[in-house]
């Protein structure tokens, strides 16, 4: 009997010591530990105590929380919305190779907002994505699995092009809406987390955002280091317009190439604006990089298409972006069973193919009641990071 009482007392002492040691951890150390965890774990720990909740919801923590960039993508099947996040980092940047990835793929499915236009999706900007439902922009936080409709624009702004920007100095996202179809001298800007009111911002550069034939330009704006870049038509011809997210000022950047260059995509190459396309005359691929914004200095890199390394690849893979390490990302236009991504470094001339398990294979289809048919219309978001920002 006495031995049992002694054991009980020992257990209670250990528990009390454990509680005192955990509660006595410095707040900065606790915050540092949380910052190294996956976002879904941090969200789960918010329910443990008021202290942990206050630490992980504080603006300084949510603004500084940043994970390693991943390749995120989704597809729709009926009213279901399947979201995947896969690693994109390269462990051997100086070598060409193929391998099957054993890393765990994070995935979930939810219900997609009805009557939303998936062709108006922006890129992933510091963890958030914006698209629209008619004239109503909607913000999506894939990490928190939340959608938030913004205040609807007035009737004069039915046809809009939506861009999403991020100011790294103040840590704020801004949604920029521009009319398309007609040239304009003004746009509408809304700062997330503020009073959610649209403000009018004017420019001295009358322009019309460039659109492809038959619709809105698909993700043709890019936010790089606090500046949104987009193609536009002006009275003097086609140019690139820049919008500084913090100062809310526009500027014009002249195109450096001639009529033989066909622009395919704008993207961020190691923190600088890059324009990828092809040369009609030489039948080659080129990448123009804006090396110096103030001096408008560009460099041009010419490289061979991926079909040079493996014939026929360009028939089945589409360019979707570039990693922070400078690798071009080619993704499949259709998935049946195996899901693989090609990463190509045009400067180093290294080529790697990665097969990811658990994406649209038989097990996945059985668990989610999907038919054994090809999956098309996948939407990809390179360099996506997790964010704990509340909408």
From Swiss-Prot:
F-box domain mapped to chain residues: 19-68
Short name of any one Pfam family annotated for the protein: FBA_3
Q: Which stretches does UniProt call biased (Basic and acidic residues)?
A: 1-12
Q: Which InterPro entries match?
A: F-box-assoc_dom_typ3, F-box-assoc_interact_dom, F-box-like_dom_sf, F-box_dom
Which parts of the sequence are annotated with region: Disordered?
Answer: 1-25
Q: Extract one GO cellular component term from the record.
A: cytoplasm
Q: Which residues cross the membrane?
A: none
Record-given protein name: Putative F-box protein At1g47730
> Which organism is this protein's natural source?
Arabidopsis thaliana
